[in-house]
Each structure stands twice: as C-alpha cells, then as structure tokens.
Amino acid sequence: MNRYLLTTLSAPLLALFFSFSLQAAMLSQEIKSGWDTFTGNVQQTWQQPDAIDVYVPAITWHNRWTYDEEHIHRYNERPWGAGGGVSRYDEKGNWHGLYLMAFKDSFNKWEPFGGYGWEATWRPLQDQNFHYGLGYTAGVTARHNWGYYPVPAILPLASIGYGSLNFQMTYIPGTYNNGNVYFAWLRWQF
C-alpha cells in the first residue's frame, strides 16, 4: 500500500518541486536584473551628469494626526541647511540624481542625508518646461538622537517643477509621535 501511494504521489511532488525551483530561479534572475539596472543608473549618473544641483531644504511638517500637541510644539519644522548633487535625464525623460544634503532635524540638530533618487517625469502641458515626477530615493542618513549611526532609507519621492527649478518632497512613515514627517526642498539645476 505504501509503495502504491509513494508511486502515485511521486510524479506530482516531483513536478511541484521543479515548479518551485523554476520560480525561485526566475525570481533570483529578476532581482539580479533589477539590481544591475539600479547600479548602472547610479554609475551613469555619477559619470555622465547633465547638471550640477543645489539643494535648499524648505519645510518639515509633522503629521498632526499622528503627533500629540506636546511633540508638535517642541519640534523644529524649519530645516535650514543646504546640499549639492549631480543629475541627468535619461532617454525616456526620467530624472536620476545623486545628492548629499544636511539640514536641521526635528530636534534642531544637524542631519545629513545622501543617496540616489529616481523619478518618472511627465510634461503634460504644451510648455515643456513644466514637469512633475513620482519615484523613490534610496540613501543613508544619520541622526543625533540615534548616535549618528548610519541608517539606510528607501522613501517615496515626488516633485513639481518649471525649467531648472524643482520642488521635491518625500514622506517618512512612522508610528505615533515618531516618523510620519513630510519633508520638502528646492532643487536648482545648473
């Protein structure tokens, strides 16, 4: 009886095993392809930039629905600072940038943030100088309240711009009284 059951189940189990192996190999290949695209874009942006960028932090806003009044009143929402970077537009018109900026964080302490940003860019008007974008940024930050240990971050990125002036923004997710911060800056391309 066991031999008959084993013989009956062996073909479907073997097919299932090979199916999972094939899916794992395909997933591994997709991850490698995505990583190769990412590193290629970073390298090309560094080696062949179209512009030099100046960054000026503009606003930090702590989401009022996720903070109590005590925290809101003691946090800094004017992140003065500056930064610089290089950027390019690819053949599809999408933006790629490498940057480093430093600004005053919620506790009014210096916070550096550097990384790579990508935005799919649209130019919906007849005036091609007007554009907006949606994408992501992947970078590293370090904060005073975390002992300035490097912390990686992948965040959403959005922008609206005209010509070489852009208003870029992100949202840092979090928990109650922590994170949930809208952060925006101006970026000029030269």
Swiss-Prot record:
<dbReference type="GO" id="GO:0009245">
    <property type="term" value="P:lipid A biosynthetic process"/>
</dbReference>
<dbReference type="InterPro" id="IPR011250">
    <property type="entry name" value="OMP/PagP_b-brl"/>
</dbReference>
<feature type="signal peptide">
    <location>
        <begin position="1"/>
        <end position="24"/>
    </location>
</feature>
<dbReference type="InterPro" id="IPR009746">
    <property type="entry name" value="LipidA_acyl_PagP"/>
</dbReference>
<feature type="site" description="Role in the phospholipid gating">
    <location>
        <position position="176"/>
    </location>
</feature>
<protein>
    <recommendedName>
        <fullName>Lipid A acyltransferase PagP</fullName>
        <ecNumber>2.3.1.251</ecNumber>
    </recommendedName>
</protein>
<comment type="function">
    <text>Transfers a fatty acid residue from the sn-1 position of a phospholipid to the N-linked hydroxyfatty acid chain on the proximal unit of lipid A or its precursors.</text>
</comment>
<keyword id="KW-0808">Transferase</keyword>
<feature type="active site">
    <location>
        <position position="105"/>
    </location>
</feature>
<keyword id="KW-0472">Membrane</keyword>
<keyword id="KW-0998">Cell outer membrane</keyword>
<comment type="subunit">
    <text>Homodimer.</text>
</comment>
<dbReference type="Pfam" id="PF07017">
    <property type="entry name" value="PagP"/>
</dbReference>
<keyword id="KW-0012">Acyltransferase</keyword>
<keyword id="KW-0732">Signal</keyword>
<dbReference type="GO" id="GO:0016746">
    <property type="term" value="F:acyltransferase activity"/>
</dbReference>
<dbReference type="GO" id="GO:0009279">
    <property type="term" value="C:cell outer membrane"/>
</dbReference>
<feature type="active site">
    <location>
        <position position="106"/>
    </location>
</feature>
<feature type="active site">
    <location>
        <position position="62"/>
    </location>
</feature>
<comment type="similarity">
    <text>Belongs to the lipid A palmitoyltransferase family.</text>
</comment>
